[in-house]
Amino acid sequence: MAPPPLHLFSPHVPSTSVSPPDPATEAPPAPKQHRGPRPAPRNPGSAKPLTAGVPGGRTRRAVLGIIRKVRSLELSDPRTPSPNGGGGSSSSSTATARVPFHLPIHPPPPEREEEEEKKGIRRAVPWAAARDEETKVVLRREKKTRVPTRAETELEAGELERLRRAARGKERWARAKKAGITDEVVEEVRGQWAKGQELAGVRIVEPLRRCMDRAREILEIKTGGLVVWTRGGIHFVYRGSSYLENAKRHRDFVNYNEELSPVTSNNPTSQGKYWSKDETLTNDNDEADDKDDKPIKGTLYEREVNRLLDSLGPRFIDWWWNTPLPVDADLLPEVVPDFKTPFRQCPPGVRPALADEELTYLRKHARPLPTHFVLGRNTKLQGLAAAILKLWEKSLIAKVAVKVGIQNTNHEQMARNLKRLTGGTVILRNKDYIIIYRGKDFLPGGVAESVIERESQVHDQQAKEEEARLKMADSLQMIVGLSSERSYVGTFREYQDFHDSHARRTTENNFRIQLEAKKHRLEKELKDQEWRLSMLTKKIERSNQVLAKLHSSWSPSKKDGDRELLTEEERRIFRKIGLKMDEHVLLGRRGVFEGVIEEIHQHWKHKEVVKVITKQNQASQITYTSMMLEVETGGTLIAIERFTTSHAIILYRGKNYRRPTKSAPSNLLTKREALQRSIEVQRRGSMKYFAQERKKSIDELKRELRNVTWEIRKLNHDTEQSWTA
């Protein structure tokens, strides 16, 4: 059985009869303009025409490009059908097919085709990739259908375009707060409308700017207007054509709500001030009468989440993410009567602590969950704790978001108080979210009450059995005349005594183990600190040896007894000259060495006064440096002046000054030795400081070790006395 004919160039397609062209009727072809290298001459017996001039050579991409070009040629010049009508004689089926390629393509023998069909082998052909590429279906990502806004549905196109043109020229707008669209922002918007302006702009800031659609809904709910245009982070709100009638109706509605009794408005919410409860939760802005005629919106999961959050408390309308809106924890009661931390009991054989894998799983599980509560206060969270306990009966995790823009919020204190009130486990806490896991030992309210009730019943039954046993023992003693001494073997009292003593011993043993572990840790740390102190001491001794070697390599000059005397007026003049000088000698970390003395003599070559700048802070160091410079240079110290970040030492060369034959003295350190001395002095000072800190920590560890040893001895003494008693 022959394979089906291929559309491109199949050897099984009957060859078409090609008549030679008539040179008289056919126009000469136009000369082709070659761009780039000319292709090699065609040779039917070689494969060079396939790849000549094609980038990529024989790669799959190049072959596919050749096949596309051949197909375009076939479509532009269709073949004439053969006179045999495709019936196909034996000569046409065995002959070489005429194809656009200059390669002889021969059909496979029929025996080979039958064997391949029996074995189910599909032969790969060069044009199969191109054929599959045409039939390949590419599924593009579908764009999210854009939901029209209220302004686009309620306003006419011409009116909407007019309002948007007016909004483009508006230069002033109100600024929302971090807390969202607050009452101040709403009043500012209505104030602009009251002045006769149709549009009022509101700039949205973080975090509400993350979801501008939600910001638009909040603006329309709270102000009663329509957002007609959005530019960047600014919403432009249209007051509406019937603004005066709506404002009058709003005032009447507010007055009516103020006349209501406090019993009917038991739980005031922020959304009740602007919109009804159903309209707020579903973000539906139509009339309430038409609500029953509309189909139910949202999936089953969304409706269940909304139903659960409705049962926990009032919703937070200024939520900066999409629905469902979380519960506003600040509107929950601060104190709940008879509230206490719930009873917990872990199942047998289960450890209450979370493993690392379990913690990672819970954090991943909490990521896609909706936010349940929004909190803005640090204390008085009993109402929130009661709502979390109710939520835990249907969910493993409670997700609490921290309000943005509220002053003095401390998420660490919030998490600590919630953990103390609920007994849960905080698995994540940051400046945005607090996620609390209910724990493995959590029991729902009904189950906890059943466990407590069952335990009380068992205790009462045991007490009744004990009372009956005692009565029976008394009656037997009266009849038989047994001894009046009562035995507690096998009784409930023996169980209670054993349980109390075992619990006490267990507590004492645990406390003793903790003290022993603390003592072992302190001893180990003390030994480590002493070893570190010994190493520091050895390094300090080694540094002292290096410094002693450096100090032995230089010697100070002798002080000249015959010194020039200067009057106060001369000192004042030289001081003024020295302070006005811009040129100076900078004394760095190396201190006084031969290079400094040489530079001072270079200054004195042209000037009588030299100014030396030093960065030293201690007065003793500055005095020692000035005296050393005076002795080594042979000059006269005029003054020591204090600047903002440094000190200036002014030296006068003297009236009988003579330049020395050797400007660099040989009794001082060289530049390299001075740097080595500076580094070693700094290193020794740091080591002395750390050695002092080590000594303080060692003294503190010894004091703690004495206290722990004394507590262990006292505990052992008390245990011995209890055993003897």
From Swiss-Prot:
Domain of life: Eukaryota
GO function term, MF aspect, one: mRNA binding
SMART domains: CRS1_YhbY
GO biological process per UniProt: Group II intron splicing; mRNA processing; regulation of translation
Start-end of Pro residues biased regions: 20-31
Interval spanned by the transit peptide: 1-71
Subcellular location: Plastid, Chloroplast stroma
Residue ranges constituting the CRM domain according to the UniProt record: 153-250, 352-449, 564-664
Biased composition (Polar residues): 262-273
Keyword Glycosyltransferase: no
Keyword line: Chloroplast, Coiled coil, mRNA processing, mRNA splicing, Plastid, Repeat, Ribonucleoprotein, RNA-binding, Transit peptide, Translation regulation
Gene3D superfamilies: YhbY-like (3.30.110.60)
Stretches assigned to coiled coil: 451-473, 508-545, 691-721
GO cellular component: chloroplast stroma; ribonucleoprotein complex
Assembly description: Homodimer. Interacts with RNA. Part of large ribonucleo-protein complexes that include group IIA introns and CRS1.
Protein name: Chloroplastic group IIA intron splicing facilitator CRS1, chloroplastic
